[in-house]
Each structure stands twice: as structure tokens, then as C-alpha cells.
A protein has these predicted regions:
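Single conserved hydrophobic/aromatic residue that forms the stacking wall/gate
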Residues: 1-8, 12-13
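Catalytic domains of carbohydrate-active enzymes that cleave complex glycans
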Residues: 17-229
Length: 229
């Protein structure tokens, strides 16, 4: 009897398509009614990863699935050549504008989900902080674009202040993210930790603290701050 029950359950699972699984997950994990589609933002959050993953570099990779490599950061605007930077990175800028809209859509979706969830709100907090992290390169690229295309000195000065704000926001974003993640994860290796000796080039093996989470962002912020001086 138990075997028949297990087989029946397996067949039921096999008969479900991806959308049915999503609805069942939303109902089971958070108590949402399937027809409300409260987890639609998760699809957008997954799409945002693709731009985030390489937004700040022109070569290299940090995808854990493929191993990490050396990388080259984006160049920064030249005050003597206004508009040249924006032309060079026009594709990144265009996508960043799309991602900015996606970010706001995700923010609204998470807010609604947090307000209506019957349980498991912690996971929604993780999604919220992940969204903020993935949006960081978008903020920085658009701020640099505003500086590069400023119409006069006053506008350029205001844009430069915005770039500085985005650099400062990185520390706030990181602190908020790690405050949430640290509820269930260690943020650094213990003293005396011995790194992997199997020669695998894992992203998580790059640092003994959480710096590897921001493999491109930390050096890019450092580069921008030096450029502003």
C-alpha cells in the first residue's frame, strides 16, 4: 500500500509543469493562493543575474559553475572627452536602464509578498537583499553615464556627487545584506582555516571573509573613488 502511494505521488510530481511547481511552492512555503501569483518577482530576480554577473567588466568571469578567471574592469569617463564613455558602453547602459525598471518591479513584488506571507518571511528578506546586490552595478553605471553626458559644469558636479553617493551606498548595501545572511550563514572562515588544496578555482575560495561575494564590485568601487580624487 505504501509503495503504491509513493508511486502515485511520484507520478503526480512528474505530471506537474514548471508553472504548477511554482504555484505549489508559493502556497506551501508562504501560504499564498496560487491565483494571486505572488512569487512572479522571482522570475525577474533570476533574469537580473545575467546582467549583474558581468556588468562591471569587459572580460573575465566569476560564475561559480565555470570557475573564476582574471578580469578587466570597465574604463571610467574622461572629463576631456564627454560622451565618449557612454558611446563605448552604450549597450551596457541600455541594459542597465532596463534592469533599473526590473529592480523596481521586483521591489514592489517583494513588498507585497512580505505583507501577505503567512510564513517564511526570512526567505523573502534574502530575496530583497539579493535584489539590492544585483542592482548595485546598475546604479553605478547609470551614475557614471549621467556624469559623462552632463551638459555643463554644474550638472557634471551634481552627477559626480551622485557617483560618490553610489560608492558610499555600497557599504550600506553590503552591511544590510550580510546582516540578513548572517542569521543562517557564517560570514568568514574561522582562524586557522586551510583553503582547498585540490586546485579547483572556486569563487568562494578567493577570500576567507565575504569579499568574494563582491568580486567585481569591491575593486570597481575602489577604482571609481581613486578616479574621483
Amino acid at each position: 500500500e505504501m509503495q503504491r502511494s509513493l508511486v502515485g505521488s511520484e507520478m503526480c510530481i512528474r505530471d506537474r509543469d514548471i508553472e504548477a511547481f511554482k504555484k505549489a511552492h508559493a502556497q506551501r512555503e508562504y501560504g499564498f493562493r496560487p491565483e494571486d501569483n505572488r512569487m512572479a518577482f522571482l522570475d525577474e530576480l533570476e533574469k537580473a543575474v545575467f546582467f549583474f554577473d558581468g556588468a562591471l567588466v569587459t572580460s573575465g568571469r566569476r560564475n561559480p559553475a565555470w570557475g573564476t578567471t582574471a578580469f578587466t574592469l570597465m574604463e571610467l569617463p574622461d572629463k576631456t572627452k564627454p560622451g565618449a564613455w557612454s558611446e563605448l558602453y552604450k549597450d551596457k547602459i541600455a541594459q542597465a536602464k532596463i534592469e533599473a525598471g526590473r529592480y523596481e518591479k521586483i521591489v514592489q513584488g517583494i513588498r507585497t509578498a512580505e505583507a501577505e506571507a503567512l510564513r517564511n518571511r526570512y526567505t523573502l528578506q534574502v530575496y530583497e537583499q539579493t535584489n539590492n546586490l544585483q542592482n548595485y552595478p546598475v546604479r553605478l553605471i547609470l551614475a557614471l553615464n549621467a556624469y559623462d553626458t552632463a551638459k555643463d559644469d554644474a550638472a557634471r558636479e551634481a552627477a559626480l556627487e551622485k557617483v560618490a553617493e553610489v560608492c558610499s551606498y555600497f557599504d550600506v548595501m553590503r552591511s544590510n545584506l550580510e546582516s540578513v545572511y548572517s542569521e543562517t550563514r557564517f560570514m568568514e572562515q574561522p582562524e586557522g582555516f586551510i583553503s582547498d588544496l585540490n586546485h579547483h578555482n572556486h569563487l568562494a575560495s578567493k577570500t576567507n571573509n565575504s569579499d568574494w561575494w563582491y568580486y567585481y564590485e569591491i575593486p570597481m568601487v575602489k577604482k571609481v573613488r581613486a578616479w574621483m580624487k
